[in-house]
Design a protein with these regions (language model features):
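Bacterial N-terminal signal peptides that target proteins for export
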Residues: 1-8
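N-terminal signal peptide c-region/cleavage motif recognized by signal peptidases
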Residues: 15-19
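Early exported N-terminus immediately downstream of N-terminal targeting peptides
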Residues: 24-105
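Extracytoplasmic
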Residues: 33-36, 59, 65-68, 88, ...
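Solvent-exposed loop/turn segments at secondary-structure junctions
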Residues: 82, 99-100, 124, 139, ...
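Surface-exposed, charged secondary-structure patches
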Residues: 103-145, 197-205
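Short beta-strand edge/turn micro-motifs at domain boundaries
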Residues: 146-172
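Low-complexity, intrinsically disordered terminal/linker segments enriched in charged
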Residues: 162-205
Length: 205
């Protein structure tokens, strides 16, 4: 099940790459276009399909990450404890949380081509700056799953700040574990926990 969720969240990452490219284009249209582009790249590039980590990371870095607001995601995941952190600690938390998400879901992005994605109509009032883009994802032998993206319109375009899989928020899932870590070991302990997890991923653990 965890593998499926990781694959779906990799799909969610893939669906956001071009959200800031054209302000007049609705976020759902941009999401659809970019999802198709990422799937096409994965299908055509044998190295990526084969799990070439260097190429996978390059794809994620160039097509996806610029359109996520990792600082806001980290702040939401850390929750009320964010205010306890110094500016330097906030920067460290954002850096390590970003690395955690990248490493976790880059490993699953090669599976995005296996899924069928249906994009739901977007109801966005004029002047709206916070939207929810909804999709339904399915795969042979698996019940359909809803993936929603929460996006905020910022000065430099639409930015994703949360992803929901079957109404389960990514930042909320992490908030529960982060709060537990802060209660036991403080902000510094949370940072060290993230550092260890990222080092373990780097070393193949």
């Amino acid at each position: 099940m965890l593998k499926i969720v990781k694959g779906l969240l990799a799909l969610a990452l893939a669906g956001t790459a071009a959200l800031a490219q054209a302000e007049m284009t609705p976020p759902d249209v941009l999401t659809k276009n970019t999802t198709n582009e990422v799937i096409r790249i994965v299908k055509q590039d044998k190295d990526i399909k084969g799990g070439n980590s260097k190429k996978v990371y390059a794809l994620v870095e160039s097509k996806i990450l610029p359109h996520f607001d990792f600082r806001q995601m980290t702040q939401l995941a850390v929750g009320k404890n964010w205010r306890q952190a110094t500016p330097e600690e906030q920067q460290q938390l954002t850096k390590e949380f970003r690395a955690l998400l990248v490493r976790t879901y880059s490993a699953a992005i090669t599976s995005v081509a296996d899924y069928k994605i249906e994009f739901k109509p977007l109801k966005m009032p004029a002047g709206e700056t916070d939207v929810l883009v909804s999709t339904e994802v399915s795969k042979s032998g698996m019940a359909p799953i809803t993936i929603d993206y929460r996006l905020e319109k910022q000065d430099n375009g639409w930015k994703v700040y949360d992803v929901l899989v079957d109404n389960v928020s990514l930042v909320t899932v992490y908030r529960n574990s982060f709060n537990s870590e802060v209660r036991k070991n403080g902000i510094a302990g949370l940072i060290q926990s993230l550092v260890r997890r990222n080092q373990s991923a780097t070393n193949g653990g």
